[in-house]
Amino acid sequence: MPFSIRRHGLAVCAAALWAGLNASAALAATPAELLAGYSAEAGVRAEPARGQAFFTQRHGQEWACASCHTANPTQAGKHVVTGKSIAPMAPAVNAQRFTDLAKTEKWFRRNCKDVVGRECQANEKADILAWLMTLK
């Protein structure tokens, strides 16, 4: 393979890698930005009290979010089945929480299916996040 073709191939790979990194950076967010997005999608204002009720209430699968994340999400939790430690959910205590849209969506999708038996709706996500953002 001639040198120029190899070099061109490397340039294409480098450009693709850079585009992927930039796309990942575009998913970075703040909890307030995610809250605004969920509220806009839901078409209603988020209510922290509804978020707390949803988080602590047992749902159809007999679990609550608080089963693993504790009723005080400023503290670390523990998965009830695996025993795996879970970092605090409150953004004020854990600066990594709710800073990546893709990761936030992944965990909402997985955990809501486990706890509620379905994906959470935008208004539920907004309410939960609004409540978590009130915790210091």
Predicted regions and their residues:
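Short cysteine/histidine-rich zinc-coordinating motifs and their immediately flanking basic loops
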Residues: 77-84
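Electrostatic cytochrome c docking/interface patches
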Residues: 29-59
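The canonical Cys-X-X-Cys-His
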Residues: 60-72, 128
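Bacterial N-terminal signal peptides that target proteins for export
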Residues: 2-13
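C-terminal segment of classical bacterial N-terminal signal peptides
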Residues: 17-26
